[in-house]
Amino acid sequence: MEWELNLLLYLALFFFLLFLLFLLLFVVIKQLKNSVANTAGALQPGRLSVHREPWGFSREQAV
């Protein structure tokens, strides 16, 4: 009786972790697709993309 309960718990834990793994994989793939789409959109020749440095000054001012 006890080993059946252990088997049930291990199976439940296994499927729960498998579900979390697939969920994480789905989120990562979705983020990668968004990142690739944003990069492709920013590199189109018709669009002007303003590149701002995170520390507040541009490369031209640094020289």
From Swiss-Prot:
Pull one GO CC term from this UniProt entry: plasma membrane
In terms of Pfam families, this protein maps to: SMIM43 (PF21976)
| Transmembrane intervals | 9-29
> What InterPro entries has UniProt attached to this entry?
SMIM43 (IPR054149)
Record keywords, A-Z: Cell membrane, Membrane, Transmembrane, Transmembrane helix
Q: Does the keyword Glycosyltransferase apply?
A: no
GO MF annotations, alphabetized: transmembrane transporter binding
Q: Where is this region: Important for interaction with SLC2A1 and SLC2A3?
A: 7-29, 51-57
The record's subcellular locations are: Cell membrane
Q: Which domain of life is it from?
A: Eukaryota
Q: Give GO terms for biological process.
A: mesendoderm development
Topology in the membrane? Single-pass membrane protein
Give the protein's function: Required for mesendoderm differentiation. Interacts with glucose transporters and promotes glucose uptake. Probably augments the glucose uptake capacity of glucose transporter proteins to meet the energy needs of mesendoderm differentiation.
Subunit organization: Interacts with glucose transporters SLC2A1/GLUT1 and SLC2A3/GLUT3; the interactions may promote SLC2A1- and SLC2A3-mediated glucose transport to meet the energy needs of mesendoderm differentiation.
Q: What is this protein called?
A: Small integral membrane protein 43
